[in-house]
Amino acid sequence: MSEQSTLAGPYTEKPGVESQNPTGDGKASFDETSPRDIHGWRWAIAYAAMLSTTFLFALDNTIVANIQPSIINDFGHLELISWIGTGFALGTMFILLWGKIYGVFNIKWVYIFNILLFEVGSAVCGAAPNIQALIIGRVIAGIGGSGMYSGTLTYVSVLSNQKEKPAYLAGSTVVWGVGSVVGPVVGGAFAASSATWRWGFYINLPIGAVFAPAYMILFPNWDPNPTLTLAEKFRLVDWINAVIFLAGSACLTVALTFGGVVYSFNSGTIIALWTVTGVLLVAFIVLLKLHPLVSKENRLYPLHFFKQMTLINMQLQVFLASGIILAMTYYVPLYFQFIKGDGALQAGVRLLPLIMFMVAFSMVNGFLMPKYGLIPIWYIVGSALTLIGSALMYTIDENTSNGNVYGYNILVGAGAGCYIVAGFAIVQSLVPTHEIANAVGAMTISQDLGMVLFLAICGSLFHNVAVDKVGKALPSASETEIGNLIAGTSSSAFQALSEADKDLVIPEIASAMKSIWAFFMAAAALSFVCSWPLFKTKLGGKKVEASVVV
């Protein structure tokens, strides 16, 4: 099979629709012919159904930010609290595999399978009898959610021409932003109500049910390889390296999450996890080069991408920006709960400045960058604002006004919004048409890795530093008691403290959070430094004629 037919996958154009970038020279050509057969109200409903999955995916990314203390109150196991968020993010590591699968199998049925998987995971979370079952449900939902997200990108790519695509993807940006904004608020509202935190997961079921007829009836059948048998299609997927990649991601996440929390950093378990991670990484790279069962064009990640420094830079930038934003959605509400005494619902509302400005500036970038270019400026200004905002967050304590915290959050949100999604457009100008699927897949996996690793690192940082500082403030408390205290203000351990002890604990928790803001500063500084080489990047002219995705 030719490279075009196997790699183009979901990005293969219909006859009469011109290639976006056949040479990879950074210049795009356009044909206003619509590549889809569905129009009018049928297309409007189908597109709305796609946006519903984007909304649910975004909602689930942030909804647990405010309900974790309630979950710990019910189940205990504080040492596993970070896995409520990390488990979902770890499940999204499947997005690299889903991108390949969408390029081989019928898009509609892969998409519907992922919707079902997401709903099953949500049901498992809502009905979970213990925290272990909840984490398993979160992983399942993450796997399905990443498949839905990849499916939306795929459908928009094959069902819209280059003139339409920015508008349709801008709609996805808005819906994703709305889902991210309301996630902590909805989660906090459920946690504070008689419905309990379980409805933070059950809510996905009725929304999915409403759009189910559209999924089944209106989603177009699109098979990128209609002449191949099922067995031939399976042979086009790099299953071995997919398993190695997922196993390595899991080992790395466990090592980062449990190190210093469940096991000491120098314990045999943590050392073994790091060793296995390293071995799997080497095996992954070797198989990218020398895989005996899969052709070069069908391997999980194109090895020659490592030689394209701008593409690697784009992956690093989305890794850093996405990690900062998602981790902020977890720790800004925690700050307001501990330091300002907010309830779960009110703390969730405090995220609005961060998320709204991030979404607004993402949309501004999506509409202006394709017209005016200035790619390095977006990255330099954006990373600088993120760095300044993170540095100012490092200065906050229990006496900082809410207005100041909002202002610092706005800087971080606006800064990240300037470039968090820009790379998705840029990479499509760096590669030939038949490799756009691979380039977008590389960006999405970098985005998800950033979210997974930042949550894991921040969870470990906060737990270790807070236990040490609070332990000094309350020398008579055991490490287990201290761990329960820092789970959140709604935890029974924190509520049981006297007002005098709370006055001792709260400043120490604010101080412990400085480790997280410092980590964000380092990440933003790296992003800023790596933005300057973009001035030397040739993208085929001042304009980037490509779509932007979230």
From Swiss-Prot:
Cellular localisation: Cell membrane
GO-annotated molecular function: transmembrane transporter activity
Transmembrane segments: 44-64, 78-98, 109-129, 139-159, 172-192, 199-219, 242-262, 268-288, 319-339, 351-371, 373-393, 410-430, 439-459, 515-535
Bilayer topology annotation: Multi-pass membrane protein
Signals that turn on the gene: Expression correlates with the production of depudecin with high levels on oat grain medium, and minimal levels on oat flower medium and complete medium.
Key word Protein biosynthesis present: no
UniProt keyword annotations, A-Z: Cell membrane, Glycoprotein, Membrane, Transmembrane, Transmembrane helix, Transport
Domain of life, source organism: Eukaryota
A Pfam family annotated for this UniProt entry: MFS_1
Glycosylation sites: N399
InterPro entries cross-referenced by the UniProt entry: MFS, MFS_dom, MFS_trans_sf
One Gene Ontology cellular component annotation held by this UniProt entry: plasma membrane
Keyword Transport in annotation: yes
Region called Disordered, residue ranges: 1-33
PROSITE patterns per record: MFS
Cited function: Efflux pump; part of the gene cluster that mediates the biosynthesis of depudecin, a highly oxidized eleven-carbon linear polyketide that acts as a histone deacetylase (HDAC) inhibitor and makes a small contribution to pathogenesis. Is presumed either to be responsible for exporting depudecin, to provide self-protection, or both.
Family per similarity comment: Belongs to the major facilitator superfamily. TCR/Tet family.
Record-given protein name: Efflux pump DEP3
